[in-house]
Amino acid sequence: MKPVIALVGRPNVGKSTLFNRLTRSRDALVADMPGLTRDRHYGEGRVGERPFIAIDTGGFEPVAKEGIVAEMAKQTRQAVVEADVVIFIVDGRLGLAPQDRVIADYLRKTGRRILLAVNKAEGMKYTAVATDFYELGLGDPRAISSAHGDGVRELVDEALDLAFAERPELAEAAEGHDHGTRIAIVGRPNVGKSTLVNALIGEERVIAFDMPGTTRDAIYVDFERNGKPYTLIDTAGLRKRGKVFEAIEKFSVVKTLQSIADANVVVLLLDAQQDISDQDAHIAGFIVESGRALVIGVNKWDGLDGHARDRIKHDMERKLQFLSFANVHYISAKQRTGIGALMKSVDDAYAAAMVKLPTPKLTRVLQEAVEFQQPRRAGVSRPKLRYAHQGGSNPPIVVIHGNALSNIPETYRRFLEGRFRDAFQLKGTPLRIEFRTNKNPYAQSNE
């Protein structure tokens, strides 16, 4: 599991600038989730070898009672609940404001680990920066510059140290859960995740490990199906009640990101009785950016007539065309129809994600593709694609070496992706292609 860091402060102190700097440290998964709020954003960042989830909040005015300001305060409180560590950001140039005192009073009562960051401190002496803010009673102020990066690495390192000290299970959560293929079932509220979970595991045969804590904790459920072991990473909110498991439909961006990151295969569940929403597309975007194998389940299919079925298929083609690599299954979790075929696709997708791609065959497929269609000339020279090898798995990465590869158009990259997919039957997994211009064994002989 990844630690969660919430950025909190009054308006215009530089929270979003810090958020962008943190999540830009890798390919950020940034969620501006319609239906949740426009004022709470989630992203993934990394410092060294330590990944984390950051939450950017709107300007916090905890005493607001109504209107958009009150809604922003509500969203900030929720971010604090989800966080392991809160970074409270104040403005070093404007100094201590009455609103800072109110926010500090609120944060002290939450029981969360709090780090006080004085932003916009570039060019200022530390004593001048810190003096005003000691009275907030939140420990030593940390001087930073979100815009220039001064002090940011040290701040985040300290936040992560606190998170792991507070909750050692963050580092240990996934250990001991290699029971089988790890599956995350994700989707917006009320699409039937809990019903599908129950259909897969059955209440009486489930062996679960329920970590103490809050809604940001993941639950791992080991089960078997047709003799094969699996581990389900809960996003539907499974909670043990006696000997029975009750599934609670509750959407959490943090839990969804955590589950996708921990999974081998993600099942994206859609509601056949509703149009594809922006929220569906955002969740799908998380999955693709994370590189996870994917199977799509369209639930509640049994209650639709032919016209409605055609409508949802057309809607998917229009809004989720970037998921064309994934198998789609039309199921009824309630009636337990279509689930066997869906699980076969889960197995196939995981196998595709972990496939070994021999260099000779990769290079042969590449050469055949180039013979069929050469890339367009870019400037004075035409790109020359020499050879290919596998650069990683889960998802598979194909590294192509050659000359003048910096201007390969996206259309040609997609063409090559299709050729590799067909040759290796890669269904259900993203496929990444990297172009590298460097020395290779063929360079002198072919020039």
UniProtKB/Swiss-Prot annotation:
Pfam family, one: KH_dom-like
HAMAP family for the chain: GTPase_Der
UniProt keywords, alphabetically: GTP-binding, Nucleotide-binding, Repeat, Ribosome biogenesis
Protein's UniProt name: GTPase Der
Keyword Repeat in annotation: yes
Binding site residues for GTP 1: 9-16, 56-60, 119-122
Domain KH-like: 355-439
Superkingdom to which the source organism belongs: Bacteria
Function: GTPase that plays an essential role in the late steps of ribosome biogenesis.
SUPFAM superfamilies, alphabetized: P-loop containing nucleoside triphosphate hydrolases
CDD domains found in the cross-reference section: EngA1, EngA2
GO molecular function term, any single one: ribosome binding
EngA-type G domain segment(s): 3-167, 181-354
UniProt xrefs under InterPro entries: AAA+_ATPase, G_ENGA, GTP-bd, GTPase_Der, KH_dom-like, KH_dom-like_a/b, P-loop_NTPase, Small_GTP-bd
Residues at which GTP 2 binds: 187-194, 234-238, 299-302
Protein family according to the UniProt entry: Belongs to the TRAFAC class TrmE-Era-EngA-EngB-Septin-like GTPase superfamily. EngA (Der) GTPase family.
GO biological process, one term: ribosome biogenesis
